[in-house]
Amino acid sequence: RQAGQGHGLRPFGMFALNSLRIEKGYRAWKGDLSTDYTVLQAGLGRFIDWDHPFRGREALAAEQARGADRRFVTLIVAHETHDAPYMSTIWHAGKVVGETTSGAWGHRVGASVALGVVRADLAQEGTELEVEIFGARVPARVQADGPLYDRDNMRLRA
C-alpha cells in the first residue's frame, strides 16, 4: 500500500477498471464481444484480412456489401443509482431494438454509461432510446462513436 503513495497512486479494484474501460468504449470478451455478433456488427471490420481465405468469408463479404443490421453503441443512461445490467433490453418506440452488453457509472464523465448493440438505423449519435433497468424503462442517448473520456488517448501512457 505504501509503494507509490508519493506519486499519488492508490489501490483500486475491478469495478474501477470496468468503469474506465466502458468510458473508453473498450469491449470485453464474453460480455461485449462474443460469437453472438459478427465482426462487422462489433465494429471491428478494420481487422479483417480480406487478402487471405478464411471460414465464413463469403457470408461476411455479403454482410459487408449489404451493411451490418446491428451495431455497437455507447449510451449515456439517465439513471444515477443503478447501472444497466448485462443483457438489459434496449427499447425504441415501444419495441425491443437491442441489448446492453456492459454498464457502469462513468466517474470521469459523471453519468451512467452502457455499451450495447442496437439496430443499425438507430446507431446514430443523439438517437433517443430506453434501457430497461430492473423493470423500469430509463431514457438513454446514443453517443458519438469512440471514447467518452480521453478521446486522444493522452492519459493511457505507461
Task: Go through each PLM region and give its residues.
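Conserved, structured C-terminal
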Residues: 1-158
